[in-house]
Every structure is written in structure tokens, then in C-alpha cells.
Amino acid sequence: MSQDLQKEVASRKTFAIISHPDAGKTTITEQLLLFGGVIRSAGTVKGKKSGKFATSDWMEIEKQRGISVTSSVMQFDYNGSRINILDTPGHSDFSEDTYRTLMAVDSAVMVIDAAKGIEAQTLKLFKVCRMRGIPIFTFINKMDRQGKMPLELLAELEEVLGIESYPMNWPIGMGKELAGLYDRYHRVIEQYRSEEDERFLPLGEDGDLKEAHAIQKSLYYDQALEEIMLLDEAGNDFSRERIIAGEQTPVFFGSALTNFGVETFLRTFVDFAPAPSSHESNEGVIEADNPKFSGFIFKIQANMNPAHRDRIAFIRICSGEFERGMNVTLTRTGKSLKLANSTQFMADDRETVNRAVAGDIIGLYDTGNYQIGDTITNGSKKLEFEKLPQFTPELFMRVYAKNVMKQKHFHKGVEQLVQEGAIQLFKTWRTEEYIIGAVGQLQFEVFEHRMRGEYNSEIRMEPIGKKIARWVKEEDADEKLSTARSMLVKDRFDQPLFLFENEFAINWFNDKNPDIELTSLL
């Protein structure tokens, strides 16, 4: 790989934004896009009433509800870096999509509501990042409202998440009393709601302002200085190495809604966020600077443009250089493909991409060739990157087309939406009736909404009373083993499994069939 290409790869910053719903993830995403010059104004998302929708929330149901249920991909340039943001679903029912997205990034930005601290979904997603060793940058949001005390939030970060924290800035007051941010890294105080030429006030060597200023009269100014002194003396030492290893999280305070502290965060993040990292494969570690092109499909999205009924496969480029029109091998099938139709995204806006490098996320128009987890490369034809996570569903519904004359629409819709991985498909063993499985109820609602809106197919769903899926070997697939509390079905790859009513039904099955091994997904 040439030095120019190495430099280009090193400039990539590919990260996901993770949070509990309503922590402000979408708002901060919009502010980042604002600084990247991609949009001219940021609108806040609160669903139907406002009529304003976030740039990253492009699907109709997201606009209606004000939540993210799919992962959007956005790209822009900032201070010499190419930024690739993946805005993940905030709703826990779509955690599988989020987990797959986290396989495609090099770092994560964790957004926390200052009033609520660490919430359930935040904790789940943090654990995945930690498990993968992904560096985590923390943005404590909504400082323009009353919330928990900053020292309390730091203690919660360290105790609940078990990670070292290092505050890069520190709030001077909060809520109505918010006066500014003490920036430990840039050695300035950033004033809240100030004129541009007075926004940043330089600090002296003693840690106080170089020149007297009205902000020093704030009730919370002296308190902030005392807390900074405490952090300097008793807090963690700053360590770039520990940040990159995912063992220390830099903490930024601010308000995405009022756009306070966001650009400072972005500027600092670009300095410290890692460049594209290596990826594990069946042929060893593939480094980003490997000259051979390779990448994996982490997401498939149908109907991003409903007028065209298209399907886009999102690929994380792991190594080398992509050029439009290049030939690659889809290693799962051994099939040779020409990558003639490729695109980059800003939510639902797209443009043709002619080249991209390791770290970039691109979309490939898919006519049915790809599956989530596929590897494509112009190198070794046997290369496969590590498997992407797949969750065992916990809710199951039989699904039918209400109008038997529209079976074609029904089957096409089910098949395409299942291929996206947001819902799983099973079929009854002999009659092959459709059963869909999900992690949470919202997935069924989104499925029904999209079937009606995108495929003109009204559906009927009926609970089947089964909640646990366990796979078996093909030689153990005997329909005679089904009972009132268990039923034999097959997944979309024709692998056999039993759906059980509860743990008691599983234990009963195991007692009766001790030689049959039951396995689950994640």
C-alpha cells in the first residue's frame, strides 16, 4: 500500500453513537453533521406534532415515533478527517441491528442523559463495546437542564460500567445556572450563550483565567475550580493508550440541544479516536493497510427509496481500496461479482461513490446476492471475517396475508424484510406456514407497518404461545417429538429447531430425550 493510501486510511474515523432512548443521540448526530457542513440547520425529533424530523431518522415509522429503529450511515469531512457515523437504533427491540453495527466501527460515542445517568440500554451496549475492546468516548448530555451532580455521574460511570473515566471538560453550573465548561484539554473556559469572540477564555498556568471576567462571579465558578483541583489530585491520569484499549473513557459535558460543547467534543474526538483497526478472519488478522480489498456486509436495507424498491447491502471496508467496477469474490458462494453500483449515504440522500478505502462504509445495490455477514474480497477466495451475532428470538407469531390474491406481495415483503435481519423467519415443518420471530414487540409493529406501506400487503399476526427456540441436528428432527408445549419448525436455512412454551417444556423434553442436544443462538 502506498504512503498516500496509508495516510488516507489513517484519516478515517468510523464510529457508532450509542445510548438509551431519549438521551439525545439523534440530536447530537445532527449537530455533528452541522459542523461537517452536511446540513444547514438541525431539527429536533419529537415525532408527529413538530413536523420536523432528524436527518438520520429517514424511515417513515421513525419520523412518526421520534425513535431510531434502523442504523443510518452518514459521512462527512472535518479537520482533515473523513468521519463515518453510524447512528444506531435506540430501541432495545432492535439491539441485534445495533450489535451488528458495532462490529463495523472502530470506536463508539456513548451519550448519557445527565438527569438519568446510566440506563439499561446504555449498559447493554457498553458491555458489547467492552467485550470487543472498542474505545468509548462519553458525552454527558442535557447540561442545560437540572440533573445529577457531575461527580456523582463520574462515580456512576466507574462503579456501574467498571471503566476509568477522565473528564476532558467540567461544567460550571447546570440547568438555568449553566455558565460554561472548563476545558482541561484545550486549557480554556467555553462560555455558555456568549458572543463568538468571547466564547473561549484562556486559562493561566495556575488553572484560573488569565484575565478577570464576569463568569468568575457565577455562583458555581469557585465550586468548579475546587472540583477540577480534586480531579487533578485524586482522579485518574489521562492515558491515550488506555483510551485506545477501551480501558479509559474520556468524558465530555455539554448540551446537544443548545449545541454547547459539541464542536469541542468533535475536535477532540478527531484527535484521539483510532484509525481503522485490524479484523479477525479464518486466515488470521487482516490489517487495514493490507493492499488487497476486503470487507463484510453488516446490514441489508430494503426500500431505502420506496419509489425504486431497491435493496442496499452496507459494507465495512476492512482493507485495501475499493474502486467502482472492480471484480470481487463473494466467498460464501465463490461467485465473482462486479461492483458497478455503489453509493455513499447521508441518511436517505445518496451519491455514487467511485472509490473508498479501509474504514469507509459504502452501500452496494443488491439484487439478492448478499446475506448479512458475507465477506467480499479481491484476495483469497476462502477469506471469511468473524461471524456477526444473531439473537435467539423471544416472541413468535404466525403471519398470514389478509388478501389471498396478494400472495406475491406478501411473500416478497416477508423475504426481503427477513433478509435485513431485523426479524427472523421460521416455517412449520410440513405445511411451511410462516412464523416470524422477534426480540421485542416493536419489531412486529415495524414489520406490519412496512409490509403495508412498502409492499402493499395487509397482514394478520397470531401469537403461537411459544417463547423459546432451540436448534437440533437434522437427524434429530422428528415431528413425533412435538407436543402441546413444543413444535418442530425450520429456519430460513432449513435447519430444524423446536419452539418451546417455557423452560419447564425444555426440561421435560430433555428428560424424555437425553441424547438430543438443544442449542441456542446468542
Swiss-Prot record:
Q: Name one Pfam family in it.
A: EF-G_D2
Q: PROSITE patterns under this entry?
A: G_TR_1, G_TR_2
User: Which keywords belong to this entry?
Assistant: Cytoplasm, GTP-binding, Nucleotide-binding, Protein biosynthesis
Q: Which NCBIfam families match?
A: prfC, PRK00741.1, small_GTP
Asked if the Swiss-Prot or TrEMBL record annotates the protein with the keyword Nucleotide-binding, the reply is yes
Q: Could you tell me one molecular function GO term of this UniProt entry?
A: translation release factor activity, codon nonspecific
Q: What is this protein called?
A: Peptide chain release factor 3
Q: Where does GTP bind?
A: 19-26, 87-91, 141-144
Subcellular locations according to the entry? Cytoplasm
Q: Which GO terms describe its biological process?
A: regulation of translational termination; translational termination
The entry assigns this protein to a family as follows:
Belongs to the TRAFAC class translation factor GTPase superfamily. Classic translation factor GTPase family. PrfC subfamily.
Relate the protein's function as given in its record: Increases the formation of ribosomal termination complexes and stimulates activities of RF-1 and RF-2. It binds guanine nucleotides and has strong preference for UGA stop codons. It may interact directly with the ribosome. The stimulation of RF-1 and RF-2 is significantly reduced by GTP and GDP, but not by GMP.
Question: Which residue ranges run through the membrane?
Answer: none
Q: Where is the tr-type G domain?
A: 10-277
Task: Report the GO terms under cellular component.
Answer: cytosol
